[in-house]
Structures are given as C-alpha cells and as structure tokens.
Amino acid sequence: MNGDNIIQALGLEAHPEGGFYRETWRCQDRAAAPRLGDRCFGTSIYFLLRAGDVSRFHRLASDEIWHFHQGDPITVAMLTQEDGLKLHLVGGMDGGIARPQLVIPKNTWFGAVIEGPSAFGYTLVGCTVSPGFDFRDFELARPEEIWSVVSHRPVDQTTQQWIQRLT
C-alpha cells in the first residue's frame, strides 16, 4: 500500500501546513483552558506526509504528541528562542535512533519532512493534542517570524537550511 492508497482508505484531506489529515477523536468533555477559552480536553488525528512533501513550520497553543504508526521515519524540526533548532527522528524502533513518540510543547515552532531515501514513500503518524485542537490556535509561520526566533544568536548552516526548507 502506498501513501495515496492510505489517503484514500482513511479519507484524509489536505492540511494547510502540508500533508494530509483526518480527525479521529474529539473529546466531548470541555473546560475553560487558560488563555484559550472553552476547549475540549483532547483531540486526535491521522497525519500522513508523503516523501518529497513538507509539513511547514507552524505552532499550536496546546501540547501535541506524535505517535508513529507506519512508513518511513520522519524528522521533526523544533525551533525555540531558548534552544534554537532541535531535530527529532520519529519512527519504528528497528532502525536505532528513531523513537515512536514525540512530545511537542505548546507554542513551539515545528515542521517535518522525510529525509533521505524513502522505503515506503510516506509516513503515517497519529497526533494527539491537549487541550483539544482548534484551528484558532494554529499558526502557520511566515519566514520573518521564524528568522526572528533565531535572530539573537549566530545561525549555523544547518539551521538556515531547515528554515528555508520548512517556510
């Protein structure tokens, strides 16, 4: 099965950041979240990225957890003023350094891409957000915003390349 077959089988739709998604769960319980207002407790989606596509830098007002399901390992780039660029490999445990789960703290700029040769042509992950995802809390990065995150420090070539790739 290839990525396009999975997109069709799971009923995935194009996501504004890149890739494809479908919400699979939205908690019916709600609460007032600090600074966010009324939100459900949690949400979950399927997210598929095909080889050659990118999930562009974006951030959420809630924590997000990525759970690897199948396909190629995927590199998630996280960018903060405090830590600069950090790269995380999410995938199956059979290849060594990849981990099957990654927590992305709220308000962290992040994006993702399949690097190197692709054995499957896609990555399928689940993303759980708490408090629950709401497009009002989703911010797609403009290049000047991302560059401002690292403007207070020397920017190495790797960071430059990732910023250019994911904006």
Question: What residue spans do the PLM features occupy?
Answer:
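Short, well-structured beta-strand segments enriched in hydrophobic/aromatic residues
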Residues: 123-126
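Short edge-strand/loop segments of extracellular domains
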Residues: 128-135
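Non-catalytic, conserved peripheral segments adjacent to functional cores
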Residues: 1-102, 111-112, 118-120, 131, ...
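Histidine-centered phosphotransfer motif of kinases
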Residues: 105
